[in-house]
A protein has these predicted regions:
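Active-site-adjacent structural elements that line small-molecule/cofactor binding pockets in enzymes
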Residues: 1-173
Length: 173
């Protein structure tokens, strides 16, 4: 990821401060009316956007580092899990809960989106929900596969329908 910043001429070491300011700017602009921001990274004169979003824009923050989890707890409306070892998920969720408590944000609504092999069965989704997961991220193609996607759309739709019938339709509402 550092090379992405190098290509753009952006300092990798300011990425945390940069996203903090970007979130403040997004929330300020989405609130309606004129907004200005004078931070260490960005300096915006009094500006506004139109039309203003009809509802608050949910901000989901990803990452497994303590800095990312603290940022999600402090500034986010939710957290995006980046995948990995399923056995590590409870510890990540516990760290996130601790950061939310420390930030005083544990009483507000908060989404937890998780990539997990448990997302593909009814019992697995229930196990995730029992851990505080609100949403699962599912895919039917390995996300890190490089090269062209040659699977026909009809096959993708078949997989999606099968998932809807075997998992989504069987969730308690």
């Amino acid at each position: 990821m550092g090379e992405d910043y190098d290509v753009l001429g952006v300092d990798w070491d300011t990425r945390g401060q940069r996203i903090d300011e970007e979130i403040a700017i997004l929330r300020g602009l989405a609130a309606g009316g004129y907004f200005e921001h004078h931070g260490k990274i960005f300096d915006l004169p009094s500006v506004k956007i139109a039309p203003v979003p009809s509802a608050p824009i949910p901000i989901l923050i990803g990452g497994h580092s303590d800095a990312a989890l603290r940022r999600a707890a402090r500034l986010g409306d939710g957290w995006l899990h980046g995948g990995g070892d399923l056995a590590e998920l409870p510890a990540l969720l516990a760290r996130l809960a601790g950061h939310r408590h420390a930030a005083g944000t544990d009483g507000r609504p908060f989404e937890v989106h998780v990539i997990s092999s448990d997302a593909y069965t009814v019992d697995g989704v229930r196990r995730l929900a029992d851990q505080g997961v609100t949403d699962v991220i599912v895919g039917f193609r390995w996300p890190y596969h490089t090269g062209p996607d040659t699977e026909p759309l009809a096959d993708k739709l078949t997989k999606l329908r099968r998932y809807a019938e075997t998992v989504i339709s069987r969730q308690a509402t």
